[in-house]
Each structure stands twice: as structure tokens, then as C-alpha cells.
């Protein structure tokens, strides 16, 4: 069995600290905590790090396809490793949630998120585990694109840092317990 934890974002230093890259930030924190290193895999169009936890292989993935094509990398890896959809978790930003709010779900629509739209289109289902991190709505007069491509202010950065620690703990808990329902009960809120 293989589990796959995917963080959504855009590759390149230009996007590194943007709100839309919260999934990449989460994966970076998780692999740092678990002392896992990434390799660039051109075949899968992703950066991949893997380790074994409880005798199961766990792949940590940052698609390098850019957000709107994330489903290409996710589908390729699910197919190659024959990963059951219940063993997939996708971490991403949600602008309909307050900054730093954490929400775990086992299914749902894309909610306007193009990375999630791409994954749903490529894997053919909305029923996969996700961890959403709130980035808040744009300020009055600001476009959504400018908001998601902007960086967090100092105050929000502190809150997001604490939330990313909770994401690390949620993923580690899930990998130990092998129970996303139990993980949702413990970490939602």
C-alpha cells in the first residue's frame, strides 16, 4: 500500500510565499519534520519525497505543472503506484475560509479552486480527502487573482505558521492512525 499527500501550489521562487502556495508550504513543513528530501521527477511532473511510516510507503508530492494542471501529476502518480483514492490527501488554500482556519473533508466540489477542478477532472471523482487552509477573501477592490497571488501580511503570517504546524500534526496523526475520519474529528476547527 502507498499513501500520497499532495500539496498544491505553483513552482518557482516568484510564487513561493504566495497564499495560493499554502499546499506547497504545508508539504515543505511536513517533509522537514519527517526528514524527507525531495527529488524532481520530470516523468511525473512533480517534486516527490517518500518514506515509510508503519511499514507503508508515503509519497509527498508537489506538482510542478502549475496549479491549473495539478491533476496531471496526481493522476499519473495514482496510476503508477496503484494508490487507492482513499489513500490520497490534497492540501490547498481556500479563500472562502478565514485566514488560518483549518478544515478537513473527505469529499466535496472544487469550490472554484482550479487545482482541485483539475484533480477532479483527471481522477474522475470528488471523493478524496483534503485539508483546506483558509486564506480569506480579497479586500474590497482587490481581484481574486491578486489576492491569491499576494503574500500574507505579518500578522497573518504568524497565524498561518501555527496553522501549518497543525497541518503537520494532522498528517502525522493520519499516517499513524490510518483513519481520516478520526483525523477530521481531532483537527477540524
UniProtKB/Swiss-Prot annotation:
UniProt xrefs under CDD domains: PTH (cd00462)
Enzyme class: hydrolase
UniProt-annotated location(s): Cytoplasm
Positions bearing the site annotation: Discriminates between blocked and unblocked aminoacyl-tRNA: 10
Pfam families, A to Z: Pept_tRNA_hydro
Chain's gene name: pth
Keyword vocabulary terms for this entry: Cytoplasm, Hydrolase, RNA-binding, tRNA-binding
Free-text function comment from the UniProt entry: Hydrolyzes ribosome-free peptidyl-tRNAs (with 1 or more amino acids incorporated), which drop off the ribosome during protein synthesis, or as a result of ribosome stalling. Catalyzes the release of premature peptidyl moieties from peptidyl-tRNA molecules trapped in stalled 50S ribosomal subunits, and thus maintains levels of free tRNAs and 50S ribosomes.
GO annotations of cellular component type: cytoplasm
Residue sites binding tRNA per the record: 15, 66, 68, 114
Cited PANTHER family: PEPTIDYL-TRNA HYDROLASE
Family assignment from sequence similarity: Belongs to the PTH family.
Assembly: Monomer.
EC number(s) per entry: 3.1.1.29
Active site residues per record: 20
Biological source species: Streptococcus pyogenes serotype M3 (strain ATCC BAA-595 / MGAS315)
Any one GO BP annotation for this protein: rescue of stalled ribosome
Catalyzed reactions: an N-acyl-L-alpha-aminoacyl-tRNA + H2O = an N-acyl-L-amino acid + a tRNA + H(+)
Highest taxon, organism lineage: Bacteria
Name by which UniProt lists this protein: Peptidyl-tRNA hydrolase
Main location per the UniProt record: cytoplasm
Sample GO molecular function, one term: peptidyl-tRNA hydrolase activity
Site (Stabilizes the basic form of H active site to accept a proton): 93
Amino acid at each position: 500500500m502507498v499513501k500520497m499527500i499532495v500539496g498544491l501550489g505553483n513552482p518557482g521562487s516568484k510564487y513561493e510565499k504566495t497564499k495560493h502556495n499554502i499546499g506547497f508550504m504545508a508539504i515543505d513543513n511536513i517533509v522537514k519534520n519527517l526528514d524527507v528530501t525531495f527529488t524532481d521527477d520530470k516523468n511525473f511532473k512533480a517534486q516527490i519525497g517518500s518514506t515509510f511510516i508503519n511499514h507503508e510507503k508515503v509519497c509527498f508530492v508537489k506538482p510542478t505543472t502549475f496549479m491549473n494542471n495539478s491533476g496531471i501529476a496526481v493522476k499519473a502518480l495514482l496510476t503508477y503506484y496503484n494508490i487507492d483514492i482513499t489513500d490520497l490527501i490534497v492540501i490547498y488554500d481556500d479563500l472562502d475560509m478565514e485566514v488560518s482556519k483549518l478544515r478537513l473533508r473527505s469529499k466535496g466540489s472544487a469550490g472554484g479552486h482550479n487545482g482541485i477542478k483539475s484533480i477532479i477532472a483527471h481522477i474522475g471523482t470528488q471523493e478524496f480527502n483534503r485539508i483546506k487552509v483558509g486564506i480569506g477573501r480579497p479586500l474590497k477592490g482587490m481581484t481574486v487573482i491578486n489576492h491569491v497571488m499576494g503574500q500574507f501580511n505579518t500578522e497573518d503570517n504568524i497565524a498561518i505558521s501555527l496553522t501549518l504546524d497543525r497541518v503537520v500534526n494532522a498528517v502525522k496523526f493520519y499516517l499513524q492512525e490510518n483513519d481520516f475520519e478520526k483525523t477530521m474529528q481531532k483537527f477540524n476547527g
